[in-house]
């Protein structure tokens, strides 16, 4: 599987995981009261669509991953650390540095945004979940973009 395909899958999985967590967050109060009552008479609504889509997308990703990579390192390391030679190790090191710098600047920005969270908590109660996933997406995109840029500069085909 190419790096662009993996990155696209990762972004889709991040989005679906964020949607699933938001759905759970919206239903969490009903779930807590459901388990808190002895009769179990309370009913809660939980949107299962994001969970089903996340499981389906994960299954497709794992199938394609298993097909393209040997079983020796199935889930131990992220896909980004499958260097074949020193050139790829150097590209990975530069991309990790770029990713670190992106997170270094995005975390304080997220902290500033979270300062204002009480002002709109009633309208967007799941805002911290969105912030966490935005940081993950920024980190991943900065890694992939830097890796591709370094790949072009290194003379790779």
From Swiss-Prot:
Covalent lipid attachment of type S-diacylglycerol cysteine occurs at 18
As given in the record, the signal peptide range reads: 1-17
Task: Show the stretches that span the lipid bilayer.
Answer: 42-64, 98-120, 124-146
Its topology with respect to the membrane? Multi-pass membrane protein
Report the GO terms under cellular component. Answer: plasma membrane
Show the disulfide pairing: none
Keywords of the record: Cell membrane, Lipoprotein, Membrane, Palmitate, Signal, Transmembrane, Transmembrane helix
Lipid-modified sites (N-palmitoyl cysteine):
18
Name of the protein this chain belongs to: Uncharacterized lipoprotein YgaO
Give the species: Bacillus subtilis (strain 168)
This chain is encoded by the gene named ygaO
